[in-house]
């Protein structure tokens, strides 16, 4: 037995050594080193960015790049250890601005702390493009690559046209460039390291960045993802145009050591990360990634959101999003693909990657479509429909929908191809507008003139009597502001966990108003000649007004128009998730005496199907859990309530009445009331505070320094419904608040 154990241990060690040797062995196949990682193990972020980057490369270079080559190169970059997350800069080059901003520390020396590179992943991708471009000797591609952005991202390098031309000249005449015929992993890493070094030494750099890269005439022992390599930048920069290939190879101190003599490299981050993600549950094809039916538990084993966190931004990174005055917008489906014309570079935009989490399944309200049926009316700011797109887009195991930017002429579409849930398409009408939402429900939107229209805050619903009054959301003192039969009636059948809300950080600016549109089309299609239209009148005054207009959506027949027809796709089955992830946040809290600037908007919802049934699953809803904070300002609020069953995970949308004042169906849907609103007694509030258990959710007016009115929301859950009541603190010198 002892002999067998020793033999087994020896064989195991031998296998490990041989595997390590294979990582850095020299071969005639230049891509062998990049063919060791399986794309099936990627997370949704990796899969998304892979196709984004591949499209970007083909847009710039118009070359047929090997899918395996691109896969393995990007896999290598994605797999490096992430030390920290931060937004390096605000360079706007779509779609690269949607990349996760991560810092990677590349150790250049194990003895000196300053022998290292701290580079953002944003820069590493540009570096890879530069490497691929110059290696393939494609001059147009090299000229088009944004080296200036690369330098800015990496070292705060201020590249001029002269310095850039000199760097490219040195780069093309260097020994390393001419020695790329044996495209080994060591040579590749030396090559990319040389790009960093060359850009750093041929331009004016900020002194504080010297720690990132230091010139050294001595060979540097470099730890790479493929093992260890030796870089001698002094010999690399020695240009010898008349040298022979043998002398060129000799000048590079990454020697061609036989694989049998190569020491065992240290375990690389690549091996570690992909061991954690090892699974066969995700099946991906090169052009149309899909996901097989699997359980939520298995998905969580594949992708952990903490493994690939979304970027975090500071308030200064997010510009304002305001509303255009007197804007008449007609929202239609846009079939334009921004990557159809590879010759035109991507249009820059300030939108960062946006994530909205939705429940797994939607079971929407069905409304017959005829000329007399009234549908939900949308008070404009954001328009929601439901859209199914089956295109070269990416699936999302975590039920995340990434709302990517759309310029005024093109739309970047992202969808969960395997889900039957609604699909979102993000549209902006101003390049300067940007919205960011992260997976941890933190978002920041700043607006001017107290305009606040939340993505889930502006739905006006046709009145509907409740079917079961006992299941309605109980709002304290509801009848006092149920003027003109505008009461809050929301049905719920799910008990939610009491998670803490995250407040929205508001910041004002002086940008002119603009319009943002969030559109989704329904799964069921209307005939192409049937259009649901909504014409609304909305003011930007945050205070409730008695003359606020309420619009009604009409379904009319129109001549057939060329609009997008969503295609069908497969389904994915999930088990019950532990909690319903919120969609959007309705959060209003501001005082304003700004004059009302009316604007109108026409929303067209056009679908096509054999059945004349419109399945309207509206994502402008208010779940009972904290929503992802997105804040704009308006006088109308959410009135559609999303509910879900704890067992079947079916989400139902029920209509509710809404007042033009305040819709207290969500703890953070709080708007300061004008003086003509009936005052809620302090005694009643104190009684409600004593009788209702739950968590405190506070929303503070950060702009009111002299009158800090703090509204405290009490929430508690029962078996069938979640009840909310409100408690407030009044300042006698301030306006009454609800």
Curated annotation (Swiss-Prot):
Protein keywords: Glycoprotein, Host cell membrane, Host membrane, Membrane, Signal, Virion
Biased composition (Low complexity): 240-263
Glycosylation site residues: 41, 64, 114, 175, 190, 201, 221, 273, 326, 353, 370, 445, 477, 483, 529, 547, 573, 629, 646, 689, 710, 720, 733
InterPro entries to which the protein is assigned, alphabetical: Roseolovirus_U47
Entry's Gene Ontology cellular component terms: host cell plasma membrane; membrane; virion component
Stretch forming the signal peptide: 1-23
Stretches of the chain forming a coiled coil according to its record: none
Biased composition range(s): Basic and acidic residues: 673-689, 698-708
Top-level taxonomic group: Viruses
Biased composition (Polar residues): 330-342, 541-554
Family: Belongs to the herpesviridae U47 family.
Protein name: 130 kDa Glycoprotein O
């Amino acid at each position: 037995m002892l002999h067998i154990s020793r033999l087994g241990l020896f064989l195991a060690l031998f296998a490990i050594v041989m595997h390590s040797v294979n990582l850095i062995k020299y071969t005639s196949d230049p891509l062998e080193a990049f063919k060791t990682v399986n794309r099936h193990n990627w997370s949704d972020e990796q899969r998304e960015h892979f196709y984004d980057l591949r499209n970007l490369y083909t847009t710039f270079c118009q070359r047929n790049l090997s899918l395996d080559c691109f896969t393995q190169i990007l896999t290598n970059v994605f797999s490096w250890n992430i030390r920290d997350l931060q937004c390096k800069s605000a360079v706007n080059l779509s779609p690269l601005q949607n990349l996760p901003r991560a810092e990677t520390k590349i150790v250049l020396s194990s003895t000196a702390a300053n022998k290292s590179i701290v580079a953002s992943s944003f820069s590493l991708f540009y570096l890879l493009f530069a490497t691929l471009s110059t290696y393939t000797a494609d001059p147009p591609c090299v000229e088009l690559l944004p080296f200036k952005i690369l330098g800015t991202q990496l070292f705060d390098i201020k590249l001029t046209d002269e310095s850039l031309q000199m760097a490219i000249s040195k780069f093309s005449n260097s020994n390393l460039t001419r020695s790329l015929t044996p495209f080994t992993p060591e040579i590749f890493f030396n090559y990319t390291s040389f790009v960093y070094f060359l850009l750093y030494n041929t331009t004016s750099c900020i002194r504080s960045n010297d720690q990132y890269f230091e010139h050294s005439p001595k060979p540097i022992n470099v730890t790479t993802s493929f093992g260890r390599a030796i870089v001698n930048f002094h010999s690399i920069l020695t240009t010898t145009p008349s040298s022979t290939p043998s002398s060129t190879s000799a000048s590079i101190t990454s020697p061609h050591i036989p694989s049998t003599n190569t020491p065992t490299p240290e375990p690389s981050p690549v091996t570690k990360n992909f061991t954690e993600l090892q699974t066969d549950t995700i099946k991906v094809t090169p052009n149309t990634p899909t996901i097989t039916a699997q359980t939520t538990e298995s998905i969580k084993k594949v992708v952990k959101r903490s493994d690939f966190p979304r970027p975090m931004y500071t308030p200064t990174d997010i510009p304002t999003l305001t509303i255009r005055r007197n804007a008449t917008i007609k929202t239609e489906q846009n079939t334009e693909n921004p990557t159809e014309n590879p010759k035109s570079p991507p249009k820059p935009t300030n939108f960062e990657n946006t994530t909205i989490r939705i429940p797994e399944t939607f079971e929407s309200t069905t409304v017959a479509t005829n000329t007399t049926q009234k549908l939900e009316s949308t008070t404009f700011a954001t328009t929601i429909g439901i859209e199914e797109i089956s295109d070269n887009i990416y699936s999302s195991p975590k039920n995340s929908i990434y709302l990517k930017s759309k310029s005024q002429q093109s739309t970047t579409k992202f969808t969960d191809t395997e889900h039957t849930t609604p699909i979102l398409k993000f549209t902006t009408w101003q390049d300067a507008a940007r919205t960011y939402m992260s997976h941890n429900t933190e978002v920041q939107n700043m607006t001017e003139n107290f305009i606040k229209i939340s993505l889930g805050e502006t739905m006006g619903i046709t009145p509907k009597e409740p079917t079961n009054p006992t299941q309605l959301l109980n709002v304290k003192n509801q009848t006092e502001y149920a003027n003109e039969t505008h009461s809050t009636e929301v049905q719920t059948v799910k008990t939610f966990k009491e998670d803490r809300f995250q407040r929205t950080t508001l910041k004002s600016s002086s940008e002119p108003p603009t319009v943002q549109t969030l559109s989704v089309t329904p799964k069921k299609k209307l005939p192409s000649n049937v259009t649901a239209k909504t014409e609304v009148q909305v003011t930007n005054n945050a205070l409730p007004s008695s003359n606020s207009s309420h619009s009604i959506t009409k379904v009319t027949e129109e001549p057939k128009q060329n609009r997008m027809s969503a295609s069908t796709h497969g389904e994915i089955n999930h088990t019950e998730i532990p909690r319903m992830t919120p969609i959007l946040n309705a959060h209003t809290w501001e005082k304003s005496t700004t004059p009302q600037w009316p604007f109108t908007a026409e929303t067209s919802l056009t679908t096509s199907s054999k059945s004349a049934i419109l399945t309207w699953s509206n994502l402008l809803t208010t779940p009972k859990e904290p929503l992802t904070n997105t804040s704009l300002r308006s006088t109308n609020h959410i009135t559609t309530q999303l509910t879900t069953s704890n067992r079947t995970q079916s989400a139902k949308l029920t209509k509710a009445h809404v007042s033009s004042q305040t819709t207290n169906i969500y703890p953070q849907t709080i708007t300061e009331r004008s003086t003509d609103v009936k005052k809620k007694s302090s005694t009643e509030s104190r009684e409600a505070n004593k009788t209702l258990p739950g968590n405190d959710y506070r929303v503070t007016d950060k702009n009111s320094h002299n009158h800090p009115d703090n509204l405290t929301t009490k929430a508690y859950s029962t078996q069938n419904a979640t009840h909310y009541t409100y408690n407030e603190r009044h300042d006698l010198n301030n306006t009454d608040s609800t």
